[in-house]
C-alpha cells in the first residue's frame, strides 16, 4: 500500500475500553463528512503500552485518544508534550508525526470550556469564584482551563486533602483548598460549580454534598454523563441555576484530535449529541 492510498487509522486505548463512546462519536463524524478512515477501540494493558505505541504508526495509525489508566503514563513515552499536557500531568490525545515522533496533548480543558460556552452562553467565569469538587486528572484539566479564562478564585474540596494540597502547589495562589466536610459551605457567591468526582455515576456512591448555599446565578456542571441528568444537576436546576451536563465536554474534547487525524474540523451540535446518545 502506497502512502497515497493509505487510509488513516485512529483509535482509543485504555483498559477497559468497552464503555467508551469515542468510537461512536468518531465513526459518526467520519460518516457525516464522507471521510475515509477508521477509529478503533483497543484494550491495552499497562505492560504493553510502550510496545503498542511503537507499533501503531507502522500499522497506519495517525494518532489515538488515551483514556484510563494510561493518560499519565503516555506523557513519559511521548517525544513532544504540550505545555498544558505537562501542567495537567496527563494526555488524552496523541499524534503520530511523519518524522516518527509522538506528540502528546490534553484537550480536556478546552473541551470543558467549549461545553460551557456553548450550553451556558451567558457564563462569565471572570465575574466570581469557582468551586471544584475533586482533585484527580479531570480536576487538573478543569482548573487549568478556569485559570486560563480568568476565574479570580478557585475553591477546591476533595475527599483526600493531600491530593488537593498537591494540586494547589502546582497551580498556585488562586486555588484555595477546603476540607471535604466543607464542600457545601464554599458555594456562596460562586458563579461556576464543577463536579469532577465520580460521585453520582452509575455504580458509584451518590452525590450528597448539601447545596443550600448555592448561588442561583451560578452555572453548575457535572463531568459525569452516565446518567446524563445527575442528582447534582437536578437539584441545581431546582435552585434556579443554569446546568450543563458532561456529555458536551466529551464531544468538544474530541474535535481537535479528529481534525488533526482526518483533516476536517467537526461540528459539535445537537445532531452529534443525538448520534452519540443513540449508541
Swiss-Prot record:
Q: Which GO terms describe its biological process?
A: amino acid biosynthetic process; aromatic amino acid family biosynthetic process; chorismate biosynthetic process; shikimate metabolic process
The active site is formed by 71 (proton acceptor)
Q: What class of enzyme is it?
A: oxidoreductase
Top-rank lineage group of the source organism:
Bacteria
- According to the UniProt entry, what is the EC number of this protein? 1.1.1.25
Keyword annotations from UniProtKB, A to Z: Amino-acid biosynthesis, Aromatic amino acid biosynthesis, NADP, Oxidoreductase
InterPro entries recorded: Aminoacid_DH-like_N_sf, NAD(P)-bd_dom_sf, SDH_C, Shikimate_DH, Shikimate_DH-bd_N, Shikimate_DH_fam, Shikm_DH/Glu-tRNA_Rdtase
> What does the entry list as the binding residues for shikimate?
20-22, 67, 92, 108, 225
Q: Which GO terms describe its molecular function?
A: NADP binding; shikimate 3-dehydrogenase (NADP+) activity
Q: What Pfam families does the database record attribute to this sequence? A: SDH_C, Shikimate_DH, Shikimate_dh_N
Q: Which SUPFAM superfamilies match?
A: Aminoacid dehydrogenase-like, N-terminal domain (SSF53223), NAD(P)-binding Rossmann-fold domains (SSF51735)
- Catalysed reactions, as listed in the record: shikimate + NADP(+) = 3-dehydroshikimate + NADPH + H(+)
- Provide one Gene Ontology cellular component: cytosol
Sites where the protein binds NADP(+)? 83, 134-138, 223, 246
Pathway membership of this protein? Answer: Metabolic intermediate biosynthesis; chorismate biosynthesis; chorismate from D-erythrose 4-phosphate and phosphoenolpyruvate: step 4/7
Query: What does the subunit comment say?
Result: Homodimer.
Function, in words: Involved in the biosynthesis of the chorismate, which leads to the biosynthesis of aromatic amino acids. Catalyzes the reversible NADPH linked reduction of 3-dehydroshikimate (DHSA) to yield shikimate (SA).
**By its UniProt entry, which PANTHER family does this protein fall under?**
BIFUNCTIONAL 3-DEHYDROQUINATE DEHYDRATASE_SHIKIMATE DEHYDROGENASE, CHLOROPLASTIC (PTHR21089:SF1), SHIKIMATE DEHYDROGENASE (PTHR21089)
Report the family membership. Belongs to the shikimate dehydrogenase family.
Q: What is the name of the protein in this document? A: Shikimate dehydrogenase (NADP(+))
Organism whose genome encodes this protein: Cereibacter sphaeroides (strain KD131 / KCTC 12085) (Rhodobacter sphaeroides)
The root-end lineage is: Bacteria, Pseudomonadati, Pseudomonadota, Alphaproteobacteria, Rhodobacterales
Amino acid at each position: 500500500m502506497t502512502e497515497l492510498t493509505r487510509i488513516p487509522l485512529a483509535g482509543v486505548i485504555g483498559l477497559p475500553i468497552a464503555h467508551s463512546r469515542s468510537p461512536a462519536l468518531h465513526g459518526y463524524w467520519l460518516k457525516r463528512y464522507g471521510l475515509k478512515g477508521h477509529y478503533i477501540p483497543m484494550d491495552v494493558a499497562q505492560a504493553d503500552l510502550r510496545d503498542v505505541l511503537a507499533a501503531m504508526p507502522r500499522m497506519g495509525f495517525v494518532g489515538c485518544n488515551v483514556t484510563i489508566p494510561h493518560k499519565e503514563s503516555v506523557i513519559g513515552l511521548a517525544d513532544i508534550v504540550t505545555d498544558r499536557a505537562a501542567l495537567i500531568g496527563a494526555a488524552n490525545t496523541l499524534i503520530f508525526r511523519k518524522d516518527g515522533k509522538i506528540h502528546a496533548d490534553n484537550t480536556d480543558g478546552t473541551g470543558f470550556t467549549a461545553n460551557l460556552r456553548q450550553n451556558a452562553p451567558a457564563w462569565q467565569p471572570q465575574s466570581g469564584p469557582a468551586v471544584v469538587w475533586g482533585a484527580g486528572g479531570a480536576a487538573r484539566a478543569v482548573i487549568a482551563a478556569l485559570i486560563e479564562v480568568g476565574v479570580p478564585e478557585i475553591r477546591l474540596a476533595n475527599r483526600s486533602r493531600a491530593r488537593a494540597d498537591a494540586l494547589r502547589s502546582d497551580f498556585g495562589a488562586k486555588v484555595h483548598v477546603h476540607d471535604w466536610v466543607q464542600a457545601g459551605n464554599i458555594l456562596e457567591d460562586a458563579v461556576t460549580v464543577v463536579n469532577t468526582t465520580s460521585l453520582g455515576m452509575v455504580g458509584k456512591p451518590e452525590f450528597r454534598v448539601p447545596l443550600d448555599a448555592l448561588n442561583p446565578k451560578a452555572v453548575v456542571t457535572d463531568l459525569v454523563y452516565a446518567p446524563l441528568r445527575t442528582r447534582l444537576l437536578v437539584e441545581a436546576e431546582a435552585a434556579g441555576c443554569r446546568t450543563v451536563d458532561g456529555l458536551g465536554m466529551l464531544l468538544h474534547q474530541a474535535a481537535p484530535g479528529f481534525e488533526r487525524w482526518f483533516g476536517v474540523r467537526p461540528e459539535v451540535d445537537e445532531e452529534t449529541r443525538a448520534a452519540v446518545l443513540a449508541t
